[in-house]
């Protein structure tokens, strides 16, 4: 019989009602895949993929890309996800998914980029929701697809541990590809741990929509690193923009709508924990760290703005100053240093002829906002060739942070300024900056993990910042649980289940059916002989009031493949165990 007390001793705080692992892959020896044109069926890519022309995933089909897949992109090629279609691209820290140039000597602009289109809201048509879809449809530039709608919670899939390199092909003088273009993308889309590197235009740009992003690294792009327009309303946390020594303009370029600065819905980005690193040696105009203009709203906090040529912040035009006056522009609790040769603010406060602003940007940032500091953040290294953007010992970035909103998106206990604290570098393993990580070893001894594996490169005393993250939450009437991302060095078997408030234990089998556990020998594995694991659960809507009150525990047990559960012992058998709980 199972000892409930013993098993509970291994289960720790987090969230679970039930845990369903939605993507786990068997390692195979994949052949080369060559693609181009229309994808009109559910499709899976793995191994080496050659993108030979523009490739469009049509609705309602899903493109799934397995960990470690490398996509080599020919000139003029690009990947477009239509409205209603999805991309499920989930790598791991050890095996990221990489989109790169097919050239033996890769360079910026070798191919296009990735464009994802959704049914999220925009202000580009002048028609407010609710409205027929044809009235709120926008045609994207450079052939990036149609987008827009009235569903802010639309999902276009998942991008996680993905790298996008050497894109930005220029169609003509007015149209070029961003590394990652998000057009009308809804907030049910998951975008985290994405690097856009050496793009010959913007790194990431939002055209309307409601997408939220986290752990984004934009490096060495020639134009703006982080850009939005057309009524974009979304959130971001842990974002890095790093300019090279030869090109690059702004850290953030933020617009509402060029044609109508008051168009509804008005752009609004809530951004916490950004690190924006410019290069004030580049002989280039328009080198601001943050440029809010054309009536955008912005809440930028707990961020570092360092080393930009023209200014740290430059508020432009009447509509944007009006936002600042009425509290819709917040730039506070930030560290600003070494911009404009140490002056930090340009006296030219507006590019709008005939308009005199009621205050300067400097007055706004340093006086009206009361918690910004003009001090050296003391980062380990801002060298563009060998950066280490974590704050060093004694850094002012380790104190003075505001508390992010407690809205289930933001990591609210990130109590530091910038995208990193002094310990954890989330770029390790999967980016061009972070080197490689060894695969996670198969367990050889009893190991119980609280949130993240101990003695593994993701350990962090703050569990919310650790990756692989083991956490979950209830939002929009759904349960979402994340239980880590790994590539194991050899196959493992994975068991999972829940414990109810009355003490009964249930396991979940390969068909996602639950079974009362009375003897470990009778427990069925959820998956066997697996080397990759990515865990994500989205359950249908439910009525929380219908659940019995008490504490619900969840567990994930990883053992060497072929383990005989009849002889399994928690005191001596090798395993990894993750646990979660929520009390109603």
Identify the residue ranges that each predicted region occupies.
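Beta-strand signatures of extracellular beta-sandwich domains
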Residues: 493-499
């Amino acid at each position: 019989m199972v000892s409930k007390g013993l098993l509970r001793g291994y289960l720790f705080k987090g969230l679970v009602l039930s845990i369903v692992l939605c993507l786990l892959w068997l390692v195979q020896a994949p052949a080369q895949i060559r693609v181009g044109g229309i994808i009109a069926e559910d499709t899976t890519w793995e191994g080496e993929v050659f993108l030979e022309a523009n490739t469009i995933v049509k609705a309602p089909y899903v493109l799934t890309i397995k960990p470690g897949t490398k996509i080599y992109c020919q000139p003029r090629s690009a990947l477009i996800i239509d409205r209603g279609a999805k991309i499920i691209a989930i790598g791991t820290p050890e095996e990221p998914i990489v989109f790169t140039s097919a050239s033996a000597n890769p360079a910026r602009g070798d191919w296009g980029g990735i464009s994802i289109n959704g049914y999220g809201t925009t202000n580009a048509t002048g028609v407010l929701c609710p409205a027929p879809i044809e009235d709120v449809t926008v045609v994207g530039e450079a052939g990036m697809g149609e987008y827009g709608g009235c569903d802010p919670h639309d999902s276009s899939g998942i991008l996680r541990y993905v790298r996008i390199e050497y894109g930005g092909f220029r169609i003509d003088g007015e149209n070029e590809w961003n590394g990652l273009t998000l057009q009308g993308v809804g907030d049910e889309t998951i975008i985290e741990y994405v690097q856009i590197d050496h793009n010959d235009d913007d790194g990431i740009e939002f055209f309307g929509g409601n997408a939220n992003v986290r752990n984004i690294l934009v490096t060495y792009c020639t134009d703006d690193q982080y850009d939005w327009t057309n009524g974009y309303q979304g959130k971001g946390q842990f974002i890095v923009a790093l300019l090279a020594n030869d090109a690059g303009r702004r850290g953030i370029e933020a617009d509402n709508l060029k044609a109508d600065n008051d168009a509804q819905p008005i752009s609004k980005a809530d951004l916490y924990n950004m690190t924006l690193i410019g290069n004030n040696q580049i002989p280039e105009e328009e080198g601001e760290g943050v440029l809010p203009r054309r009536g955008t709203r912005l809440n930028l906090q707990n961020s570092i703005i360092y080393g930009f040529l023209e200014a740290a912040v430059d508020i432009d035009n009447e509509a944007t100053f009006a936002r600042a006056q009425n509290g819709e522009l917040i730039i506070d609790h930030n560290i600003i240093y070494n911009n404009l040769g140490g002056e930090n603010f340009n006296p030219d406060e507006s590019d709008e002829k005939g308009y005199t602003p009621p205050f300067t940007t400097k007055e706004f940032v340093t006086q009206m906002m009361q918690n910004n500091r003009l001090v050296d953040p003391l980062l380990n290294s801002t060298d563009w060739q060998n950066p280490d953007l974590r704050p060093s010992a004694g850094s002012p970035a380790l104190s003075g942070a505001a508390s992010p909103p407690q809205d289930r998106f933001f990591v609210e206990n990130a109590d530091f300024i910038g995208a990193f604290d002094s310990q954890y570098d989330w770029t390790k393993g999967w980016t061009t900056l972070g080197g490689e990580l060894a695969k996670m070893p198969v367990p050889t001894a009893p190991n119980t993990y609280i949130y993240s594996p101990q003695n593994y490169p993701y350990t962090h005393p703050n569990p919310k910042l650790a990756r692989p993250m083991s956490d979950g939450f209830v939002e929009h009437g759904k349960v979402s649980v994340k239980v880590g991302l790994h590539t194991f060095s050899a196959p493992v078997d994975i068991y999972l289940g829940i414990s109810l408030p009355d003490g009964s234990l249930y396991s979940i089998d390969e068909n996602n059916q639950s079974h009362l556990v009375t003897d470990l020998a009778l427990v069925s594995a959820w998956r066997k002989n697996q080397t990759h694991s990515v865990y994500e659960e989205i359950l249908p809507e439910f009525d929380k009031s219908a659940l019995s009150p008490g504490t619900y525990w969840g567990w994930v047990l990883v053992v060497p493949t072929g383990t005989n559960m009849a002889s399994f012992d928690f005191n001596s058998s090798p395993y990894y165990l993750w646990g979660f709980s929520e009390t109603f």
